[in-house]
Amino acid sequence: MASGPSVFLLNVSGQIESAEFPEFDDLYCKYSFVYGHDWAPTSGVEEGISQITSKSQGGKQALVWNFPIEITFKSTNPFGWPQIVISVYGPDAFGNDVVRGYGAVHLPFTPGRHARTIPMFVPESSSRLQRFTSWFMGRRPEFTDPKVVAQGEGREVTRVRSQGCVTVSFNVVTKDLKKLGYNTGSGDFPNATTMSQP
């Protein structure tokens, strides 16, 4: 007698499509996945770095990367559902690479194609003296580990400033979630076009 599945799978492919940073140009991004203890990547790439892109000449002036992402996870429970953390970098006035934004978003729960716009932020110096010193030395405040963005610990005392946004598209496939008793809501509701009208 065959037993049921003991894990479920989450496969995500897609791309880091573009960004809007009105004040900056010639940016690149790094991404990594953050997930709970019960999760394990089974295939794909956990972190990567994109090419440098310049603003398009059109009216929107978007920074287009179209950088592919693909990863498969296995888990026994949804606690610690994976998040993608994106860090954007670019040159400052002195040519030093500095962080231009951090952001994170959970991978979508439901199968299908999804697009997410991630608001980005940067850490701020807490005093004018620190701000001047960091500008003069060419070292702006940044996280030693960008994955801290996906965690809540210590974030309440971090001073940040909103700056730009990044658009990411996801294609999500799940396997055996329903067999383990987890309902993501997909496919459980009748299609509005096939419902009978009173």
Curated annotation (Swiss-Prot):
Q: Name one GO cellular component term.
A: centrosome
Which Gene Ontology BP terms does the record give? cilium assembly; smoothened signaling pathway
Q: Start and end of every C2 B9-type domain?
A: 8-126
Localization: Cytoplasm, Cytoskeleton, Cilium basal body
Q: Which domain of life is it from?
A: Eukaryota
Keywords from the named record: Cell projection, Cilium biogenesis/degradation, Cytoplasm, Cytoskeleton
List, alphabetically, the InterPro entries matched. C2_B9-type_dom
Quaternary structure, per UniProt, is: Part of the tectonic-like complex (also named B9 complex).
Give the protein family: Belongs to the B9D family.
Tell me the function of this protein: Component of the tectonic-like complex, a complex localized at the transition zone of primary cilia and acting as a barrier that prevents diffusion of transmembrane proteins between the cilia and plasma membranes. Required for ciliogenesis and sonic hedgehog/SHH signaling.
Report what the protein is called: B9 domain-containing protein 1
Species the sequence originates in: Xenopus tropicalis
